[in-house]
């Protein structure tokens, strides 16, 4: 009987230890906040700033039918845009998309007759997505790229456009 009691105590102790280990693992994996460090990435344009003839900027708040366009032709403004995008810190992670995003797009028209589009969708404060079909990327950014629309050159005229013109 003494041996049986000893075995029962050992068995119970082992089972309790296993249960505590399972609880600890579960807590570590599922209940503690997981902080994944995403490596920052940069845009690598397949062209140089000197190759850009002009940049068409498009913007709408939530509804594409309300889109407007500005055309950037001044070399300084083109260089400013180019450099801002080259210097952005982007992350290769998904964003939580919501309907009615504010969208600001940029079409870099190049001297060889081609163009390169960047589309920025803002889903909330410091929560945006920058994508390019030609560049083959879709990155998260906390940068306020939408502010380029208002702040680049306040003298640029915004004209209403048809939704079909959007990148």
Residue spans of the language-model regions?
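Function-determining sites in protein domains
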Residues: 3-167
């Amino acid at each position: 009987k003494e041996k049986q009691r000893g075995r029962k105590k050992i068995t119970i102790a082992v089972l309790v230890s296993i249960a505590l280990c399972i609880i600890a693992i579960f807590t570590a994996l599922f209940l503690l906040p997981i902080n994944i460090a995403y490596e920052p990435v940069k845009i690598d344009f397949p062209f140089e700033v000197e190759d850009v003839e002009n940049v068409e900027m498009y913007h709408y708040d939530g509804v594409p039918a309300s889109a407007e366009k500005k055309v950037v032709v001044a070399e300084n403004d083109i260089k400013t845009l180019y450099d801002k995008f080259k210097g952005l810190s982007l992350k290769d992670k998904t964003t939580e998309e919501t309907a009615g995003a504010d969208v600001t797009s940029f079409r870099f028209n190049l001297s060889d007759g081609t163009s390169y589009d960047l589309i920025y969708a803002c889903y909330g404060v410091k929560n945006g997505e920058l994508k390019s079909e030609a560049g083959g990327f879709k990155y998260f950014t906390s940068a306020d790229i939408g502010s380029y629309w208002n702040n680049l050159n306040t003298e640029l005229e915004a004209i209403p456009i048809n939704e079909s013109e959007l990148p």
